[in-house]
Amino acid sequence: MYIFEILLKNPDSSIVLLENERKTKMYERWDKVLKNHPKYFGVLSRVKFVPGQSHQNFVNLMKCSDVLIDPYPFGGCNSSLESFSIFKPLVTQPSIRINGRFTYGFYKKMGMDEMIANNMEEYVDITTKLLKDKEFYDKQVNLLKER
């Protein structure tokens, strides 16, 4: 529901996801969500799947993205480090599992708490702020460059 909420709040945005073996399961889950939350029905067309990428193409895809989001509750590790290496802010929310806490730990170590959400509402709000507030976005980029 996180990505649906982001898309509801940001009608000019799309979300790009990499295809993988879980795509069918994701669609099944989304089907259940859409049945219970019809407000999300219109945003599904703005979720784009692209095939798996080579490392360089993946980094290039990240570079041309406006905002990166850590997939909650799964999180990231290598992809988070790659986003930092190209100075792209990444919204995260720590989960209870270790793989969902790496980005949180990286941000804590860097003193960048503004990119850490405590719940879905904050996650969506931080993502929206990065998309709409250039000063906030630039501040996060500069903090990454300083680290």
Task: Please report, for each region that a protein language model flagged, where it lies by residue.
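Short hydrophobic signal-anchor/transmembrane segments that target glycosyltransferases
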Residues: 1-12
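Short, structurally constrained coil/turn elements
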Residues: 9, 43, 109-111
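Loop/turn elements at helix/coil->beta-strand transitions in domains of secreted/extracellular proteins
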Residues: 11-13, 87-88
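Short beta-strand segments
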Residues: 14-20, 51, 92
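Glycosyltransferase donor-sugar binding loop
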Residues: 15-31
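Nucleotide-activated donor-binding/catalytic signature segment of Leloir-type glycosyltransferases, i.e.
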Residues: 28-52
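Short acidic active-site motifs
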Residues: 56-58, 79
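Catalytic binding pocket for nucleotide-activated donors in carbohydrate/polymer assembly enzymes
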Residues: 63, 67, 71-147
